[in-house]
Amino acid sequence: MLFPPGIFSEATAFSHKRSIRSISSHSTFDDVTAETDEAPVLAEVEKMPAVVKKVKHGMRKVLESLGILDSKCEQKKKHNKIPSAAAGDSPIKTFGYPFYDTSLGRSLLRPQVGLSFIEGFMQPIKVGAFDWMVQGTVDDVLSFLVCFDDYEAIAEKLGEDGAWHSEGNIGPLYLQLQNTSQYQGDASSILMAYSVEQILGRIDAWGVIDQTIGHWWKPAASLSEKAKSVYDTYQSLKERVPDLTTEKFQEVWNSASTKSGVGKLKELAKLFTLNPETRDLRDSWENLDRVDRGRKISLYVTSYPKRSRTMATFAFGENRVKLGDMAAAVAAATKDTTLDNLLKKYL
């Protein structure tokens, strides 16, 4: 079922046409396909979105009524204990940072330390160099987010000094929703097309882009492996930075290939600071009709949102967000008639 108009559609957004390319970053996935669609333009806000505030107010009662709350997590909280992923408290297993397992020939999700209570501290999710994701049914994802509702997710941005920053004018943390089946895999087999580590690895592997690789920006069967890898990297970055040109990309790639350590990150940071006006915020979901709540979903947490015809996008007004607020945003996005009626009752 596609998302119907509901009681929380408080804001609209303008869209404009962009050329979007859906691309896999690994050779075992589908070849590059070109698509043209509307990409979100996000309008700035300075406080927690009103839609999140409204839904969060009555969300726990609503989810309890629907039988979505995880009993193990709720019991732990009733005894004044803190749920921890490391202790096995998560109601689902498909969450974390994607990595490609060469022995299995597919990508998996690694939780790492985020959402674990370690040495007296609630370890946050951090995104920037990598995206983080959770997958399952809508009920699965809501149950998971509410279980860890007091944990934080922190968006980091790559600064011109080559370091990752979480303080200052960082910008928003973004949520993106997508149906898992878009990638023709099960709930743990989606390979992310983006990570800073992967980009740097390709620069190290191939070195300077020179005349020997020809027109790398024009995909063709005759392209060398190096040219194809350069093209793939450019396309995965362009999904995050729509105004990136081939000339600027090649300039930064070649400069980064001559640097080491932090020097490489300083060069790469130039790509993510292009046209900052394309990263404005907004206070409501954009393009929810692209996602079917009746099927399994992937929820991405990111600093650098992807422009995709298969994704819905939500931006918070800050870079530190509790998972409880994420749950409210997802609940607002994935509502149906039953949820709408319950929200009206409790709000």
Curated annotation (Swiss-Prot):
GO terms for cellular component: cytoplasmic vesicle; extracellular region; microneme. Its main location: cytoplasm. It is found in: Cytoplasmic vesicle, Secretory vesicle, Microneme; Secreted. Keywords: Cytoplasmic vesicle, Secreted. This is Microneme protein 21.
